[in-house]
């Protein structure tokens, strides 16, 4: 473990690249996790879930004139 940490901290360029790579990977995983949670939490409120209800009755509207 110490040798891996030593190799990462040996040069500043490797250290910075490791930080940027880790941040990039974390951002991707975090984005996917939050989107999945958001869609599960708002299941009946999202457009993709209620679109059928609104488009289904679109041509059936009657004019009272």
UniProtKB/Swiss-Prot annotation:
Its main location: membrane. It holds the Pfam family UCR_UQCRX_QCR9. It is a single-pass membrane protein. It is found in: Membrane; Mitochondrion inner membrane. GO terms for molecular function: ubiquinol-cytochrome-c reductase activity. SUPFAM superfamilies: Subunit X (non-heme 7 kDa protein) of cytochrome bc1 complex (Ubiquinol-cytochrome c reductase). Disruption phenotype: Leads to decreased vegetative growth on several carbon sources such as citrate. Keywords: Electron transport, Membrane, Mitochondrion, Mitochondrion inner membrane, Respiratory chain, Transmembrane, Transmembrane helix, Transport. Signal peptide: none annotated. InterPro entries: QCR9, QCR9_sf. Induction: Expression is also regulated by SSN6. Gene3D superfamilies: Cytochrome b-c1 complex subunit 9. One of its GO terms (biological process) is mitochondrial respiratory chain complex III assembly. The chain crosses the membrane at residues 14-34. Component of the ubiquinol-cytochrome c oxidoreductase, a multisubunit transmembrane complex that is part of the mitochondrial electron transport chain which drives oxidative phosphorylation. The complex plays an important role in the uptake of multiple carbon sources present in different host niches. Component of the ubiquinol-cytochrome c oxidoreductase (cytochrome b-c1 complex, complex III, CIII), a multisubunit enzyme composed of 10 subunits. The complex is composed of 3 respiratory subunits cytochrome b (COB), cytochrome c1 (CYT1) and Rieske protein (RIP1), 2 core protein subunits COR1 and QCR2, and 5 low-molecular weight protein subunits QCR6, QCR7, QCR8, QCR9 and QCR10. Belongs to the UQCR10/QCR9 family. This is Cytochrome b-c1 complex subunit 9, mitochondrial. The lineage of its organism: Eukaryota, Fungi, Dikarya, Ascomycota, Saccharomycotina.
């Amino acid at each position: 473990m110490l040798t891996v940490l030593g190799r990462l901290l040996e040069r500043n360029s490797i250290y910075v690249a490791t930080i940027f790579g880790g941040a990039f990977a974390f951002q991707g995983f975090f984005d996917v996790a939050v989107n999945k949670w958001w869609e599960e939490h708002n299941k009946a409120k999202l457009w993709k879930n209620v679109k059928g209800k609104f488009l289904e009755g679109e041509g059936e509207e009657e004019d009272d004139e």
